[in-house]
Amino acid sequence: MSGSKLSTPNNSGGGQGNLSQEQIITGTREVIKGLEQLKNEHNDILNSLYQSLKMLKKDTPGDSNLVEEKTDIIEKSLESLELGLGEAKVMMALGHHLNMVEAEKQKLRAQVRRLVQENTWLRDELAATQQKLQTSEQNLADLEVKYKHLEYMNSIKKYDEDRTPDEEASSSDPLDLGFPEDDDGGQADESYPQPQTGSGSVSAAAGGYEIPARLRTLHNLVIQYASQSRYEVAVPLCKQALEDLEKTSGHDHPDVATMLNILALVYRDQNKYKEAGNLLHDALAIREKTLGPDHPAVAATLNNLAVLYGKRGKYKEAEPLCKRALEIREKVLGKDHPDVAKQLNNLALLCQNQGKYEEVEWYYQRALEIYEKKLGPDDPNVAKTKNNLAAAYLKQGKYKAAETLYKQVLTRAHEREFGLSADDKDNKPIWMQAEEREEKGKFKDNAPYGDYGGWHKAAKVDSRSRSSPTVTTTLKNLGALYRRQGKYDAAEILEECAMKSRRNALDMVRETKVRELLGQDLSTDVPRSEAMAKERHHRRSSGTPRHGSTESVSYEKTDGSEEVSIGVAWKAKRKAKDRSRSIPAGYVEIPRSPPHVLVENGDGKLRRSGSLSKLRASVRRSSTKLLNKLKGRESDDDGGMKRASSMSVLPSRGNDESTPAPIQLSQRGRVGSHDNLSSRRQSGNF
């Protein structure tokens, strides 16, 4: 071993000295050399003795004893030399082995040091990983709580009476399937419904091919079933119609392509994108073969394929299809047609999902120019396109440009609803008042909109679709942008107006549904606000105490012949301690959530129904009965009295001549009754 010491006799004084391993090995090597020389000398002497011994045995046998003794001594010395040489070689091998052991030991020590360091690192990493695991478990628990909360909120969303049409709209909006009146080829919420055209223009736009009326009816029926998620009815209906068309007209017929498009729409709603894609490819081949490669129907099918690829996230595959559809529409319809603008919007959306923002801006700006030129600056598509362009600006961080577009939309809506007067300093768009409040830090005393809430009247619902009101969306987006800039007071004003706009939009949709159910002529109806103003004036002039309130949607014919009121009666004031409900005998209590309505069966009793379709059927039956009864007893009525029909429940009170109080409900609910109206009028209870 290196550095080890061995004791050996000292030549000078016979004392003990310490030798290192290297010195011992060096001395051993010298000893081996000396022993080798002695061995060789002894071998030479031994050989000479052997020769002398042979000669003496021949000449004088008596003198050979001395030589033999010498020979024995030399042989013993030679054996001792060989033994010494062997031991010296063993010592040399042992020294070499000790050196190897020492080197291995040093190597193992270095490895131990490295392993100790690695172990320290691993312990640190393990501690960090355990900390991350603990944090992840905590986040997972929080996410589970949030997920359950969102699940609950989603479950009760359908019971929210203040939901706007955009919240109620489903993802089953029709695609561009070749039906001009349903030409909606946008993706999801980015769609742009186009103005309806007559049958003549439809035929002209289709290049002489007009879609049969039966296919239009079937399309609307399938859309209705799909919107109700009744795919088990819609799919067999489409397949049967497709089979019949193929038998009568053959596979390569435009009607077959149209039916393939309808079936593709149903499969799209079921998220069966592969089946829908196969059908659209088949329809595209048929239309290209029968109608030509530059036909508008081919562009519609290409657009549908692009939408389908977009829904699957295949934006690169969808972009060339959308561009080809754009080229066809520009060639057939002209570069300034609204359908071209709609296609530009779809193409911009695909490019936006790929991050091609320069192309996105160009497409949106060109679409905006077309809409403003052909449809006018007040068309809803202009505001929608500006909103989409502003969204693209936001994704690029161009907040100033987005803010400018939002303000343009709100300013135009303000001018359209309230007008613009340079003399009236208070007649300003809502964003101006919001920024003034932000600067002053308080509400203005002379706010022209009544705490800024009346501005929601400017948020009109697009009558051609159930998409969200553009102005309401703009209010929310600009409010979010103000919050990003730290303008919290201004954001609160816009958000408050957006909330009131949602409720106003819901009322307008309900009014439209009521008009459709009752078959009223929209052009001869007095607006709801005027009818309700007349009702309030009549109540104030009569001095009738207001024990209960009735929220109603009223319409009055301009000729004064009939007034129709659809009302919901409930208690105007409720005490916190009194939760009891005053409901006449024979009627059913209407809970608020989930919302149900009371409809009347044939026996005159009310039953609860939670289906809008059942409500419509009941309203139609009740309206028919009411009209028949009114026609049969029209001569008995006073000519100066205005006839009225009410869908509100009028409880019977026997022969009491006093005015019946409305039904008092602690929660809102809709009620309908018509069958006993004439009998009540005759008995004096009307």
From Swiss-Prot:
One of its GO terms (cellular component) is cytoplasm. GO terms for molecular function: kinesin binding. Phosphorylation may modulate the process of mechanochemical coupling. Residues 1-23, 158-204, 520-558, 586-686 are annotated as: Disordered. Belongs to the kinesin light chain family. It comes from Strongylocentrotus purpuratus (Purple sea urchin). SUPFAM superfamilies: TPR-like. This is Kinesin light chain. One of its GO terms (biological process) is microtubule-based movement. Residues 20-160 form a coiled coil. TPR repeats lie at residues 215-248, 257-290, 299-332, 341-374, 383-416, 472-505. It holds the Pfam family TPR_12. Oligomeric complex composed of two heavy chains and two light chains. The light chain is composed of three structural domains: a large globular N-terminal domain which may be involved in binding to kinesin heavy chains, a central alpha-helical coiled-coil domain that mediates the light chain dimerization; and a small globular C-terminal which may play a role in regulating mechanochemical activity or attachment of kinesin to membrane-bound organelles.
